[in-house]
Amino acid sequence: MANTAQARKRARQAVVQNAHNSALRSRLRTAIKGVRKAVAAGDKTAAAAAFKTAQSTIDSIADKKIVHKNKAARAKSRLSAAIKAMAA
């Protein structure tokens, strides 16, 4: 239990920050799922469009350090590879 005023304030802030970070992580997963769904449907133009928006989302979330930059790079790389594999 937070006993000092400072600790109580940090506990309040942690609740708000956790909710915000969870929302951002959810947005990341949704963006990735959108690309995966377009790839599974075989729609290359939709997959490319979804990837473009997902790339921006992934980068912004990595910049905010919600996910590690290497995880973001890995996600973008795998999505890009999945789209390229559609053409082959």
UniProtKB/Swiss-Prot annotation:
Listed GO biological process terms: translation
GO molecular function: small ribosomal subunit rRNA binding; structural constituent of ribosome
GO cellular component: cytosol; small ribosomal subunit
Taxonomy, superkingdom: Bacteria
Record keyword Membrane present: no
Record keywords, A-Z: Ribonucleoprotein, Ribosomal protein, RNA-binding, rRNA-binding
Signal peptide limits: none
Keyword Lyase: no
Stored InterPro entries: Ribosomal_bS20, Ribosomal_bS20_sf
Job description of the protein: Binds directly to 16S ribosomal RNA.
Entry-linked HAMAP family: Ribosomal_bS20
Name the UniProt record assigns to this protein: Small ribosomal subunit protein bS20
Species in which this protein is naturally found: Ralstonia pickettii (strain 12J)
